[in-house]
Amino acid sequence: EREKEFEEMATKDKDEKFLIQFKDERNELRFTLASDKIVYIESSDNYCIIKYINNNEVVDFLLRNSLKRLSEELKDTPIQRCHRSYMVNFEHIASLRKDNSEISLEFDVKGIKEVPVSKSYNDKIMESFVKFSKQNSFHLV
């Protein structure tokens, strides 16, 4: 019962941001972060590299888990899959760049490279971009 109370407290903080719990492939809790601290997640073989902000610096956390599994766990969050190797946090997307048929996402965090969007995710990402741009100040480039 106490554990349940802690989980409920951990899901939201004062600013209505929520905490995201990252579990490894064995479903063991490894890392918990406020949603607005996560910039993007990149897959690397059987690992995911979580890029997040800590003391105004972007740092990495290596998690043994698949991007597919993480995308299922995070489906109701602003963190969306945009490529077979990437998930992005729409809380940090500054712009969506369309060059011919290629789409890429640019972040509002210094020193972070833009992330490509696979053609298979184009519609979903455009939909998410419109949805989140109403909440934040994004622009189409």
Question: What is each residue range found by the language model?
Answer:
Residues 2-141:
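Basic, polyanion-interacting recognition surfaces, primarily
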